[in-house]
Amino acid sequence: MNEVFLMGKIITCIKFGFIINSKHFSKATFNFKLVDEQVIQINAYDKIADYIYSKLKQGDNVFIYGKLCKNVVNVIKIKIL
């Protein structure tokens, strides 16, 4: 896995759900538009997913530190800009 540092805007509603029979308890997913106009999918799990669902909304500008896994970025840390 590769580490990534991303800056951009949340462009979709944040989808939140619970996971059964997994090492993770909850998951948040949204699409993210980078400064250079590329769109990527972002996943977050557990406490980070709870934070994202409760504090962030569509249109927020954020900075993401995460890991690239296939075509998706898994969030390690996130900060509102």
What are these model-predicted stretches?
Residues M1-L81:
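Single-stranded nucleic acid-binding surfaces, predominantly the OB-fold ssDNA-binding core
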